[in-house]
């Protein structure tokens, strides 16, 4: 008996097979990608471990302004620095005597402070590394022509540089600035009587909540001073301190000229211990 055509697609089975093969190929590709990504993560972890064959190294950083110092510490730490096969872990410390880096304005008073602490810079030309606008904070903004120095309070223990710059800018002469820094210093921003019309000398980044900031046309510029080793800072930490200073200065997009000239008498009067601490 002769066979007759059924009218069905003779390639139906081949089409289903192709679809199945495509699905299998996609699954295989996904598995390969997953395994590859796991391998990359493992490889980067292993590479990091190989870079840090010497382990971790704590880098102590002191700063005349905690906000400026912490900003630089955070930025350097986020870069995952490796120095001499150590994974460097920067942290802020209170004492210059314990530090491998000192962050402070590059002034004669700062150099005298280092000398008094028995520390010496590891480089002859330390670079500017950070800046912040300074001004006053109060219940309301104030016009500079209406701002007199007797209305300003200076939290020298927390913000020495801002206090010096604001006093110099607002007082207009060194004698009045020194007198204000001596007589109108406060222990902290909490002591400010904003409702009584007082204004706080502060960096813009440190304005207390609820107060309004008015700039006085000056920036505080901080230099990262890498320090030589001593009995508390070893050679590896000193070398890491130099890397910290290099990193900070390369990221800094301002100049030392952003900070107006302020006399040494005013800088000294803005120290927490007052001008008598520096001779």
Language model features by range: what are they?
Residues 138-140, 144, 170-175, 248, ...:
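Short, well-ordered alpha-helical segments in soluble proteins
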Residues 126-135, 209-242, 269-276:
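Periplasmic-binding protein-like
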């Amino acid at each position: 008996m002769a066979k007759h055509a059924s009218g069905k697609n003779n390639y139906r089975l081949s089409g289903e097979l192709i679809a199945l093969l495509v699905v299998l190929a996609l699954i295989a590709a996904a598995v390969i990608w997953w395994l590859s990504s796991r391998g990359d993560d493992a490889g980067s972890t292993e590479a990091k471990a190989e870079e840090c064959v010497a382990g971790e190294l704590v880098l102590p950083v002191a700063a005349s302004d905690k906000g400026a110092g912490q900003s630089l510490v955070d930025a350097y730490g986020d870069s995952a620095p490796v120095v001499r096969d150590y994974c460097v872990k920067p942290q802020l410390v209170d004492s210059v005597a314990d530090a491998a880096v000192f962050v402070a304005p590059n002034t004669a008073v700062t150099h005298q402070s280092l000398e008094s602490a028995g520390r010496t810079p590891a480089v002859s030309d330390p670079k500017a590394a950070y800046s912040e606008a300074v001004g006053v904070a109060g219940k309301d903004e104030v016009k500079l022509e209406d701002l007199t120095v007797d209305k300003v309070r200076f939290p020298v223990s927390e913000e020495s540089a801002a206090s010096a710059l604001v006093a110099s800018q607002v007082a207009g002469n060194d004698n009045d600035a020194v007198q204000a820094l001596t007589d109108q210093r406060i222990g902290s921003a909490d002591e400010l009587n904003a409702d009584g019309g007082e204004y706080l000398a502060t960096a813009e980044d440190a304005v207390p909540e609820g107060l309004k900031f008015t700039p006085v046309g000056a920036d505080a510029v901080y230099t990262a001073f890498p320090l030589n080793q001593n009995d508390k800072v070893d050679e590896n930490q000193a070398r890491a301190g130099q890397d910290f200073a290099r990193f900070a200065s390369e990221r800094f997009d301002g100049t030392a000229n952003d900070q107006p000239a302020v006399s040494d008498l005013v800088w000294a009067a803005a120290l927490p211990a007052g001008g008598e601490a520096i001779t």
